[in-house]
Amino acid sequence: MSNLNLATLDISEHANLPTSSEVLFKAKADKKLSFESIAAAIGRNEVATAAIFYGQAKASEEDIAKLAQVLEIDHAHLESLLSGFPDRGKSVSFPPKDPLIYRLYEIVQNYGYAYKAVMNEKFGDGIMSAISFSTTVEKETDKDGNNWAVVTWRGKWLPYSRF
């Protein structure tokens, strides 16, 4: 795989990331592995795998063992870095400054109430879980050769309780 298409990390740009992020990204870059290939090796979704790298998802014991193997990181060291609970949401300033992340924020800002209205009509009064949740990213090319990002969010519907 070409180095040109690998997500890397400049830790100086992300002061709030955990120490594990620097270790994981360095090993990923050294081995020239994509999130897709790492995810396949550990049996996880590529977005979930990337979330572990950014300290936004909890790695299981099995994840840690497989990551240590595929990235050739000392298991005990990786376990010491990843055994705690993630401090989610802390790693990014708000609003985000990265253009792609800002566009995701902008989508929710512009269409959030429309999503809410349609979901309420389909499911009733409630919320879509970001805990019982999965997401995928696919690449689609149209007949004119234009590339499109297809992002799917799948969250369990949680109706509000009456009390």
Curated annotation (Swiss-Prot):
User: Which keywords label this protein?
Assistant: Lyase
Q: Which reaction does it catalyse?
A: cyanate + hydrogencarbonate + 3 H(+) = NH4(+) + 2 CO2
Q: Which gene encodes it?
A: CYN1
| One Pfam family named in its UniProt record | Cyanate_lyase
| A GO term, aspect molecular function | DNA binding
Return the InterPro entries for the record.
Cyanase, Cyanate_lyase_C, Cyanate_lyase_C_sf, Lambda_DNA-bd_dom_sf
Domain of life, per UniProt, equals Eukaryota
Name the active site residues. R103, E106, S129
What this protein is called in its record is Cyanate hydratase
The record ties this protein, via Gene3D superfamilies, to: Cyanate lyase, C-terminal domain, lambda repressor-like DNA-binding domains
Q: What role does it play?
A: Catalyzes the reaction of cyanate with bicarbonate to produce ammonia and carbon dioxide.
SMART domains documented for this protein: Cyanate_lyase (SM01116)
EC assignment: 4.2.1.104
Q: Which GO terms describe its biological process?
A: cyanate metabolic process
Entry's family note: Belongs to the cyanase family.
